[in-house]
A protein has these predicted regions:
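N-terminal "arm"/small-domain region of PLP-dependent enzymes with the aminotransferase-like
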Residues: 1-28, 32
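Short beta->alpha linker loops
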Residues: 11, 32, 36, 54-55, ...
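Structural motif corresponding to alpha-helix initiation and N-cap regions
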Residues: 13, 35, 107-110
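Hydrophobic alpha-helical segments typical of transmembrane helices
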Residues: 15-18, 37, 84
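Phosphate-binding glycine-rich loop
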Residues: 27-74, 88-92, 97-100
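PLP-dependent aminotransferase-like
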Residues: 65-129
Length: 131
């Protein structure tokens, strides 16, 4: 059996201080730290606007909705993934198409992906196992 190591989070005193500062400010979600982070991300990406959401799940669903993906559409994702990769496809009314992984990498098989693409395929949600 091939074991996949997961690394512990890299949290330094600087991150702990930032979290404490945010908590002491009384703002947890939509406060000045969030607005500043959105501004910096937008600048980094070379765009005027960015928005923070509470999870990657929310981001995936919003992306599918912005792309206009819904009933009658197919979205391909990995069969080896967290539930969010597939559940967001169902939330927008599209049909999930699950692709098996390569045995050595546990990433979506490109050969299987190519075979699964149809005229109804509107997006692919790749999965980076282990982050």
């Amino acid at each position: 059996m091939h074991k996949i190591p997961f690394s512990p989070p890299d949290i330094t005193e600087a991150e702990i201080q930032e979290v404490c500062e945010a908590l002491r400010s009384g703002w947890i979600t939509t406060g000045p730290k969030t607005k500043e982070f959105e501004r910096q991300i937008a600048a980094y990406c070379g765009t005027d606007k960015a928005v923070c959401l509470n999870s990657a799940t929310a981001c995936l669903e919003m992306t599918l909705r912005i792309l206009g993906i819904g009933p009658g559409d197919e979205v391909i994702t990995s069969a080896y993934t967290y539930t969010a990769s597939c559940s967001v496809i169902c939330h927008v009314g599209a049909t999930p198409v699950l692709i098996d992984v390569d045995e050595g990498s546990y990433h979506m098989s490109v050969a299987n992906l190519e075979k699964a693409i149809t005229p109804r395929t509107k997006a692919v949600i790749p999965v980076d196992i282990g982050g």
